[in-house]
Curated annotation (Swiss-Prot):
Its EC number is 2.3.1.15. It comes from Shewanella sp. (strain MR-7). InterPro entries: GPAT/DHAPAT, GPAT/DHAPAT_C, GPAT/DHAPAT_LPLAT, GPAT_PlsB, Plipid/glycerol_acylTrfase. The keyword Translocase does not apply. This is Glycerol-3-phosphate acyltransferase. Pfam families: Acyltransferase, GPAT_C. GO terms for cellular component: plasma membrane. It is found in: Cell inner membrane. HAMAP family: Glyc3P_acyltrans. Its main location: membrane. It catalyses: sn-glycerol 3-phosphate + an acyl-CoA = a 1-acyl-sn-glycero-3-phosphate + CoA. The gene is plsB. Pathway: Phospholipid metabolism; CDP-diacylglycerol biosynthesis; CDP-diacylglycerol from sn-glycerol 3-phosphate: step 1/3. Belongs to the GPAT/DAPAT family.
């Protein structure tokens, strides 16, 4: 390797500085990988390349890592900082031997034998000039630009054409101390290290570029030859009394309507546009858990992303983040309503495939779509779909639509060999640009059809949207899920492939709910969501600034000291910082008087802010319920609190997709924190510290509307034990409207008929609609709910339930 200060390298670095823009994966190697700044470090690269090492040098300087040009000096032994598996490839002739690099491995291993305390980190580094995966009918451009082992001339062309799309990826370090102790220090282990590294680099390239792209028409012909589609075409011809040729043409039309037409060139252009867009809209995108997903890709999993659906921005945000995290943007299942010009063709070339809202018993369409999905899985493309089926208008997760999840499980049952893993993804925003439209729709306004004019209208409203949040939840590998749900599933399917297993539908429902629960497990508690939660629980939606900051400090402490799950993320900074962020985004108003500043939510903004509160209300619903128990009782035992929480938790779990694994432990941890923070005192029983009552009342306020709903339901059930589910749903909704009108409840979900349906289904499952005479459970929960309400609200509910027009 030429010396760092040689004229040749200086010239090369100057050229690259002006032609090359490098993206680092992961963005912070020290935070995301196992790198240790206190230990010596060497880099491993696949191929010796002056331009690659020059690009690496630029990045290591910025990251505070050792320069690849600095030799590694250990115990008097001088070795290159970069170890390459292959020598340079000349324009003509054979590649240079890799023996010098194997000898370097040997020297490093030998030093470990001499110096027992030494532990050099070997860090694999992959460089990519562009990320074109290539096509099955590859073009000359791909041949020139996208070879894995380019000559110096081809590398020059790659830098010229693809220098703005250079990616440098660091991987977890390998301990040479471990290798030396476990496997020895001879030439054999050096060769083994080289082989393992080659496999690693090959897998990394597959993760970064994705599988080879098919020719779209060739893909159609391949799908039409499949046995299941041929059979579906024959059945279509017979049932519609048309020729097989006509049925085949219909199938081709369906394929053309459905199939993506992924274009790497468009993705590169979109990356530039989206970088501009995110920088204009957001002050930052916060990401948690990407490394575990990158590892799943590396291990050969077929990845299916299942995000929550807040906004049309979701399609763009997740793909953009995955691209910058060194993974290929997925093929996205988009509603056919988004297939309008010009967005539809652009989405299609960005990887979207389109799905009808309903298949309406169309067997041919179903067969075509299923076969296309199978093909995506078989070829190794990652897939994304929204299991809610549409965007949430209230900020809460919607009940899942199980169609796509069922199709994914069916693909596994039909014999996908690779592990198929669902990745729940929580997407959050400090500002959702459609939120005002959502509340118009909830108030009865008809939903507007998507069009290019809506796009232009949205662009006009672009402004400071704060921050975005992408949290990857705990993955679910479907083969493992099936082993847990139906241990003999492989045998059953092999014995009768055409027979639908009896356990399949219940399993799909369980899986869908598990996905939604794990999305909520990965929630992001941000400045906007936390501040909305506090202010909406206060009288008049307003608080003194110092009290608001103190309450936020309590909530931050609660989330950090008693974490909801390890996948949840919590805003940085203290309460003062969070309030300032919210004010800068103009989400809250501030006024001053001689006694201090007051932060409030404007009356016309209150409904809007419930959307953001609802994103994270599940994180605080149990602490809020505990606070309600404490503030409504002068003294209460831990056992009594746990009993109340146990009674309400099944409904909370169904309504809010909660997944607390050890509820008694969680309740006790929350109580212990309250005691430690001086909010509660404990002798034989628990009681609120008088000076801290206001904080506990604020926390208790977050569960009040939920308890009002439960009080409505259980008062109705206790008063009319034999009422039907449909009656309970309609009368609960009617009573909720009355309660809202009398007590000023504006949260849209309070009047959501679907929510009362969800609760009635859960009540039936829990046995509250049974014919047994003993209704003591219903009466107990009714009394508990009533005891936790304000007297005026309780009186309205009890009086309304016993009123003549309800019964």
């Amino acid at each position: 390797m030429p010396k760092q200060d040689s004229l040749w390298l200086k010239s090369l670095r100057w050229i690259q500085k002006h032609l090359v823009h490098t993206i680092v994966v992961p963005q912070d190697p020290f935070a995301d990988l196992n790198l240790d700044a206190s230990r010596p470090l060497a880099y491993v690269m696949k191929t010796e390349s002056l331009s690659d090492i020059a690009a690496l040098s630029e990045i290591t300087t910025k990251l505070g890592l050792p320069s690849p040009y600095e030799p590694l000096v250990v115990n008097g032994v001088v070795a290159p900082r970069v170890v390459c598996l292959e020598g340079r490839k000349p324009l003509f002739g054979e590649r240079a031997s890799n023996e010098p690099f194997l000898e370097c491995f040997m020297r490093l291993l030998a030093v470990h034998k001499e110096k027992p305390e030494l532990d050099i980190q070997l860090v694999p580094v992959s460089l990519y000039w562009g990320r074109t995966p290539g096509k099955e009918d590859d073009t000359m451009k791909a041949a020139v630009l996208e070879r894995e082992n380019p000559t110096w001339l081809r590398k020059c062309l790659m830098i010229l054409f693809l220098g703005r799309h250079n990616f440098v990826q660091f991987s977890n370090a390998v301990s040479l101390r471990y290798m030396a102790d476990e496997h020895g220090t001879d030439m054999g282990i050096a060769h083994k290290l080289a082989r393992v590294a080659r496999v690693h680099f090959r897998r990394q390239r597959k993760v970064m570029t994705g599988p080879v792209l098919p020719n779209r028409q060739a893909l159609f012909h391949s799908l039409l030859k499949s046995e299941s589609l041929r059979k579906a075409i024959q059945e279509e011809a017979a049932s519609k009394k048309i020729s097989e040729t006509q049925a085949r043409e219909t199938a081709i039309e369906y394929l053309d309507e459905i199939a993506a037409n992924y274009s790497d060139s468009l993705v590169r252009i979109a990356e530039r546009f989206l970088t501009w867009l995110w920088n204009k809209l957001y002050s930052g995108i916060n990401i948690k858990g990407a490394e575990q997903i990158r590892q799943l890709h590396h291990d050969g999993h077929e990845i299916v992303y299942v995000p929550c659906h807040r906004s049309h921005m979701d399609y763009l945000l997740l793909s953009y983040i995955l691209y910058y995290q060194g993974m290929v943007p997925p093929h996205i299942a988009a509603g056919i309503n988004l297939n309008f010009w010009p967005a539809g063709p652009l989405f299609r070339r960005g990887g979207a495939f389109f799905i009808r809202r309903s298949f309406n018993g169309n067997k041919l369409y179903t067969a075509v779509f299923r076969e296309y999905l199978d093909q995506l899985f078989a070829k190794g493309y990652s897939v994304e779909y929204f299991s809610e089926g549409g965007r949430s208008r209230t900020g809460r997760l919607l009940a899942p639509k199980t169609g796509m999840i069922a199709m994914t499980i069916n693909s596994v049952l039909r014999g996908i060999e690779r592990p198929v893993t669902l990745v729940p993804v929580y997407l959050g925003y400090d500002h959702v640009m459609e939120v005002a439209t959502y509340h118009k729709e909830l108030s009865g306004k008809k939903k507007q059809k998507e069009s290019v004019w809506q796009v232009f209208g949205a662009i006009r409203k672009l402004g400071n949207f704060g921050q975005g949040y992408v949290n990857f939840g705990e993955p679910i590998t479907l083969q493992n899920f099936l082993n847990e749900t139906a241990p003999n599933w492989r045998t059953e399917v092999a014995d009768d492939p055409e027979q639908k297993p009896t356990w399949l539908t219940p399993a799909v429902n369980v899986l869908a709910n598990r996905v939604m629960t794990r999305i909520n497990d990965a929630a992001a508690a941000s400045s906007i969501t936390l501040t909305s939660l506090v202010l909406l629980a206060s009288e008049q939606n307003a608080l003194e600034r110092c009290l608001l900051e103190r309450q936020l400090d309590l909530y931050l402490t609660l989330l950090k000291r008693v974490p909801y799950t390890s996948f949840t993320s919590v805003a940085e900074g203290d309460g003062k910082h969070l309030v300032q962020q919210g004010l800068e985004l103009n989400k809250f108003s501030i006024s001053a008087d001689p006694l201090g500043e007051i932060v409030s939510i404007d009356a016309n903004q209150a409904i809007t802010m419930t959307y953001y509160r609802n994103n994270i209300i599940h994180l605080f619903i149990i602490p809020s319920l505990i606070a309600s128990c404490l503030t409504n009782n002068k003294q209460i035992s831990r056992a009594s609190i746990l009993g109340i929480v146990n009674d309400f938790y099944p409904l909370l779990k169904a309504e809010l997709f909660m997944g607390i694994k050890d509820l008694p432990s969680y309740v006790n941890q929350v109580l212990d924190l309250f005691i430690e923070q001086g909010l509660v005192q404990e002798s034989d029983t628990l009681s609120v510290v008088t000076e801290r009552t206001s904080q506990m009342l604020l926390l208790a306020g977050s569960v009040s509307e939920t308890l009002q709903r439960y009080a409505i339901i259980f008062n109705l059930l206790a008063h009319r034990p034999k009422m039907e589910r449909s009656e309970l749903e309609s009368e609960s909704h009617l009573l909720a409207q009355r309660l809202g009108a009398l007590h000023g409840i504006t949260a849209p979900e309070f009047y959501d008929k679907k929510l009362y349906n969800t609760l009635s289904v859960k009540l039936k499952e829990l046995g509250y609609f049974s014919e047994k005479e003993d209704k003591s459970d219903v009466e107990r929960i009714r009394d508990q709910a009533n005891s936790l309400l304000r007297a005026s609200v309780r009186q309205t509910i009890v009086a309304s339930v016993t009123a003549e027009h309800i019964v």
